[in-house]
Amino acid sequence: MKITTKVKDPYTLGQVIQQSRMILGVSQRELAKELGISQKWVWEMEQGKPGILMDRLFSILKRTGVTLSAEFEVEDMREK
């Protein structure tokens, strides 16, 4: 089953990333190590901590009327 969420701000994006990571059973530390970034950076992303890049991105999206969606797969337990 696919879950699709409309992403309106950094917080929503962070929540989607966190949900997907948790469903995959991957810790913040594991994800950070795999990507070569700090665990703190993963935590900040999941918390929707604003940064210049994110603020600009969402300002441009809003001003131009562009919508952003995030989609991830969830195993449907009913199928088992």
Which functions belong to the PLM regions below?
Residues 1-22:
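A short, Lys/Arg-rich alpha-helix, primarily the initiator
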Residues 53-71:
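DNA major-groove recognition helix of helix-turn-helix/homeodomain DNA-binding modules
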Residues 15-30, 34, 59:
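Short basic helix-loop element that most often maps to the first helix and adjoining turn
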Residues 36-50:
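Recognition helix of helix-turn-helix/homeodomain-like DNA-binding domains
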Residues 3, 69-80:
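Short, charged recognition helix plus adjacent turn
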